[in-house]
């Protein structure tokens, strides 16, 4: 993990930081494991970003177990989402809208991917993430699975999102298949000429509609 801000957020969220590597002239992060001071130029060689941050850390993964689904009322499901930036943005939107957890089906990009972590702006540490879980398991928890589509289903604003729901969003290129294991279909009506919204944009719209309905009671 790269960057003092993200490392600090991981510490604040209770994640276990094993050790940190600090560039010359930079201050280590308090509580972020053993400190390794690097010689000049080393950070440029080990960092993954073009403009390296002065602090890099090794962090133990701390994702949630499937049991969280038993009590969750608002779930976001990323089904085969491949782009790290999209998943990071989805995590950020889900956390901001108050989702109880984000479920990643098999084949979805790794949430510990550095690009996911950066795009999430730290949300990956704050919203529970359940990995390698399929839609059957979500349904068995008694959650209504709402498949998203560009061409079928009720409008998201006409759908009762106050229930225990899982908003299911598919792969960027293919979306959800017509025979996806969902209970209902919803769509985002829009006036533009494009066929559909980007998956991360759609996630944001839907998450905040869930939040709006739950605040207003309708």
List the predicted regions and their residue ranges.
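Short beta->alpha connector loops at strand-helix junctions that form conserved
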Residues: 38-40, 79, 105-106, 128, ...
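RNA substrate-binding interface of SAM-dependent RNA methyltransferases
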Residues: 60-64, 68-152
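Short, polar loop motifs at secondary-structure junctions
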Residues: 4, 22-28, 134-135, 150-152, ...
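Structured adenosyl-cofactor binding patch, chiefly the S-adenosyl-L-methionine
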Residues: 57, 95-97, 108-125, 178-218
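Short loop/helix-cap segments at secondary-structure boundaries that form the rim of catalytic
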Residues: 26-33, 66-69, 138-140, 159, ...
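Active-site/ligand-binding-proximal alpha/beta "capping" segment
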Residues: 146-194
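Amphipathic alpha-helical repeat scaffolds
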Residues: 3, 82-89, 196-202
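N-terminal positively charged helical leader segments and presequences
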Residues: 1-50
């Amino acid at each position: 993990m790269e960057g003092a801000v993200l490392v600090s957020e991981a510490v604040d969220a209770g994640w276990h930081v094993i050790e940190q590597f600090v560039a010359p002239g930079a201050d280590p992060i308090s509580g972020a494991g053993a400190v390794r001071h690097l010689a000049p130029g080393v950070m440029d060689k080990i960092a993954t970003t073009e403009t390296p941050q002065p602090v890099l850390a090794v962090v133990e993964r701390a994702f949630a177990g499937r049991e969280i689904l038993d009590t969750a009322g608002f779930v976001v499901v990323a089904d085969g989402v491949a782009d790290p930036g999209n998943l990071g943005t989805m995590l950020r939107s889900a956390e901001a809208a108050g989702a109880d957890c984000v479920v990643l089906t098999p084949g979805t990009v790794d949430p510990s991917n550095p690009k996911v972590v950066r795009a999430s702006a730290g949300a990956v540490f704050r919203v529970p993430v359940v990995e390698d879980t399929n839609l059957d398991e979500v349904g068995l928890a008694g959650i209504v699975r709402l498949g998203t589509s560009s061409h079928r289903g009720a409008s998201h604003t006409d759908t009762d999102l106050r229930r225990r729901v899982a908003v299911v969003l598919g792969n960027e290129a293919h979306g959800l298949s017509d025979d996806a294991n969902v209970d209902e279909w919803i769509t985002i009506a829009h006036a533009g000429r494009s066929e559909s919204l980007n998956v991360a944009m759609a996630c944001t719209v839907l998450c905040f509609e869930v939040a709006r309905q739950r605040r207003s009671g309708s």
